[in-house]
Amino acid sequence: MWSPRCVGFDPAYFLTFADDRQKYSYAASFAIPTLPDEFIDEYKKRLNGFQKFSVREPSGEKLVKELTGRTAETHLDPTLLISADEWKKIAVSKIDKPYILIFTANPAVSLVDFALKLSKEKNLPVYCINDAPHPVSHGINYIVAPTVEEFVGCFKNAEYVVTNSFHGTAFSVIFNKNLFVEFKNKSGRNIRSEGLLKSLGIDREIVDGNCRETEINWYDVNEKITNQTIISLDYLKSFVSGG
C-alpha cells in the first residue's frame, strides 16, 4: 500500500487523518527495493508520524530504516493470518475436474506460454482468472470477474497454479498448491512474492519459461506460517490493547 507505483500519495494510506499517537502500520508493502529520489522527502514526512512499523517484506525494513532511522518488523500478509480451513468455508467452485490455474497481476504472455506447456505435460485444462483486459489465448478457459467466494475456490480446487501475483502466491501457499511463480516483470521484480517464498523455503521461480518442479515440504511450510502468525498477532495485540 506504500508503493508509489500503486497509490501515489493518497493521504489515507499514510493515516494523515489520524492523530500521530494512533498511527501503526501492519504488513505494509513498498513493493520496490528502493524509492525514486523524487519520493524520498515526501515519504520521510508521511512516515515519521507512525508509532510502530510493520512491513510485508525484508526490503521494507531497510527502507523504513533509511527513511526514518527507526526499526520495522516483517509480518505476514493478512490473508495468511486466516487458516486454510477458514478460507475453505467460503470457497465456491464451478469447476468439477482437475485444472491448472493462471492468475496474473498484469498481462504476461510468458506465464500463459508456461501454463500451456505444463498443460501438455500434465494433460490438464488451463483456466485463467481474467478481470483485466489480458490477451486472449487459445486453449485457455477464462473466468471473468469472479466473486470473492469463487476467487478463493479457484485456488482451493486447482492442481497447479501459475502466477506473478503476490496474492496468487499467498493463496497457493494457503491451500498448499503446486505453484510456479514468475518474479520478473515489466516493472522490475516482484519482491513481495519472492520474499514470501524465500521466508517459507519454497523454490518455484519461473525463469526464461522454465521452472524445476522441486519438492515442497508443506509440513515445514505450514509450521513456519503458524509460528509467523503467532508473532504477527502478538504485534497487532501490542497496540490494539494500548501497548
Outline where the language-model segments fall.
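Aromatic- and Gly/Pro-rich donor/ligand-binding loops
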Residues: 1-45
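Nucleotide-sugar donor-binding and catalytic loop/hinge architecture
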Residues: 18-20, 87-99, 242-243
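Catalytic donor nucleotide-activated moiety binding site of glycosyltransferases and closely related
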Residues: 24-32, 60-64, 104-105, 110-147, ...
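Acidic anion/phosphate-binding donor-loop and adjacent secondary structure
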Residues: 32-38, 80-93
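A short beta-strand/loop micro-motif in the catalytic core of glycosyltransferases
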Residues: 51-57, 162
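Donor nucleotide-activated moiety binding/catalytic core segment of transferases
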Residues: 72-80, 84, 131-132, 136-164
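Leloir-type glycosyltransferase catalytic cores
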Residues: 142, 196-243
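A donor-sugar binding/catalytic signature common to diverse glycosyltransferases
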Residues: 154-195
